[in-house]
Structure formats: structure tokens, C-alpha cells
Amino acid sequence: MADLLGSILSSMEKPPSLGDQETRRKAREQAARLKKLQEQEKQQKVEFRKRMEKEVSDFIQDSGQIKKKFQPMNKIERSILHDVVEVAGLTSFSFGEDDDCRYVMIFKKEFAPSDEELDSYRRGEEWDPQKAEEKRKLKELAQRQEEEAAQQGPVVVSPASDYKDKYSHLIGKGAAKDAAHMLQANKTYGCVPVANKRDTRSIEEAMNEIRAKKRLRQSGEELPPTS
């Protein structure tokens, strides 16, 4: 009987020591503080949402505003604001590289931003509609000029005409025209006039002969044969 009673007493939980009591007390206090912080955070979210709902409502009623930029917010606040804007039937975007500096802009549906405007905000620049319109016009002008140049095709230069114009002030228009015809007829063999591929005269010799023929036509003399 004594052994049975001793076994029962030894199996019973011993009373907590002073150290265990202190640990449990701190755990209860920490749990209470955590619960209080959670309640405060929840209340702050509720108040923040009410404040955003009022600002969005004022924005909608103000006919002079088409967009509104908010101060930088943390991720949770931005999420709440996006939700409020969506419920109100508006459009919203977040901009900014660093998370601490990101902000929200809201737009009325009928004044939704273009891709160019959004790109400007993403680059951290202010949107200037006038500059954007000027840039668009310059781009369209450059495109039209390219299309017109493509339709006209490459410029074709006439070698005979160029030769005639180049030497007309030296040997006269008639002689220059004759030289141009000679070069054009013999272009298969190069730029030097050729007679059955045996004429090895230079351009200057050919021009001298043309001058001589011109003088003879004017004076009525007869041109001596050339070797």
C-alpha cells in the first residue's frame, strides 16, 4: 500500500519553480502586447481606408481634376488605395523605383493616360502634353519624308550629259556633244574612244581632233589624214 501511494505521488506534476513562473508570465505579457498591436494595426487600416475613400470621393466630384498624385506610401497602404480606386470605378498606377518612395496616381476613366504618359512617369519625369505633341508631329514628318524618298527611288545620273556639261566651256557645246556621243557609243571598252579596239588615242588627243575638225568646218579647209 505504501509503495502504491509513493508511486502515485511521484507521478504527479511537481509545482513550477520560480524560474518557470517568470517565463510563463513574460510569455503572457508578450502575447498580450502582440494582440494589442494587431488591433491597433487593424484600426489604422480602417481609418486609412476611410480617409482614402473621402479623398477619392472628393476627387470624383471635382470636375476640374482629371488626375491626382498621392504622397509616397508603404506597400499595404498602396494596396488599400488601389482597392478603393477600383471600387470607385477609377484607374490607378504606382510609380517609383524604391519601395519607400513609390506613390499612387489615380485617373478618371475618361482621361486614362496614354502609354507615352505612363512611360514618362516611370522615368520619373513630369508629363508635358505640348512637348509630347511636338515630338509626335516631328516623328510623323520624318516618316512621311522617308516614304516620299522611297517612292521617288534612286537618282539616275547620265554620264553623257555630265561629260558634255563638264567640257562645254572648254571646247564649245557642239564639240562637247560630239565627244559625249563618242564616249557613249564606245562605253563597252572604257572611257577612251575606240575604233575596232585598235584606237589607243587619249581623251586629249580625241578632243584636239574634234577642235581641229571644228576649225576646218568654220574655215572651209580640209583636215589632213591622221596615222
From Swiss-Prot:
The modification N-acetylalanine is found at residue 2. Residues 21-46, 119-147 have a biased composition (Basic and acidic residues). Pfam families: R3H. SMART domains: R3H (SM00393). GO terms for molecular function: nucleic acid binding. The modification Phosphoserine is found at residues 114, 158, 202. A motif (Nuclear localization signal) lies at residues 35-51, 122-139. Detected in fetal brain. Keywords: Acetylation, Nucleus, Phosphoprotein. Gene3D superfamilies: R3H-like domain (3.30.1370.50). PROSITE patterns: R3H. GO terms for cellular component: nucleus. Residues 46-109 form the R3H domain. InterPro entries: R3H_dom, R3H_dom_sf, R3H_sperm-antigen, SPAG7. Its main location: nucleus. Residues 1-46, 118-160 are annotated as: Disordered. It is found in: Nucleus. PANTHER family: SPERM ASSOCIATED ANTIGEN 7, SPERM-ASSOCIATED ANTIGEN 7. This is Sperm-associated antigen 7. The gene is SPAG7.
